[in-house]
Amino acid sequence: MIILKNEEMAKQLFMFVGLMQREPIKKMQKISQGEMAMLGFLTYEKSETNPKELSERFNLSTARVANTLNSLERKEYIKRVHDSIDRRKVMDYITEIGKEVFTETETEALNEFSKLVAYLGEKDSLCLLKIIDKIQEFYNQK
C-alpha cells in the first residue's frame, strides 16, 4: 500500500483537475469553455439574457463577458438586440446555429464521460460521484 503525504496528494489532485479540464474538452475546438457555458445558460436556463446578468451568474467581469459575447456573435451563435428606447441596453439570444453547436459539443463531451464511466464500472463511478459531491459540499461552504 502506498502512503502519500497531504502535500503529495494535493499535487496529484491538482494535476488531475488540470487533466479533467483539458481531456474531455479537447475535442471541442469550435468553442471555448466560457462560450460553452454561456450557450448552456441560454439553452437550459434563460432563452434571453443581458451582459450584466451573465456577469453576475458566472462571476466574471463585464469586460470578459463582453469579449465572450462578441466572439459568440461573430460566430453567429447568438444574436444581440439593442433596446429600441435605450440603445445602451442589449439583450442576447441564442441562434439556431448556436443551439446546434451547443448540442453537438455537449453530446461529444457526454460521450467522453460515458467512456470514462464504462471504463470505471458502476461501483467506481458511484464512488467517484460520491467524492465529487463531497468536493462540491466543501467548496459551497466557503
Language-model regions, residue ranges each:
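N-terminal leader segment of winged-helix/HTH proteins
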Residues: M1-Q29
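N-terminal helix-turn-helix DNA-binding core of bacterial DNA-binding proteins
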Residues: R22-R64
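C-terminal regulatory/oligomerization modules of transcriptional regulators
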Residues: M1-L4, E8, K123-K142
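Alpha-helical linker/hinge and terminal dimerization helices associated
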Residues: L13-P24, F58, V101, T105-V117, ...
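N-terminal positioning helix adjacent to the helix-turn-helix/winged-helix DNA-binding module
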Residues: Q12, I31-E35, I97, D124
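Charged, amphipathic alpha-helical coiled-coil/dimerization segments
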Residues: S71-K130
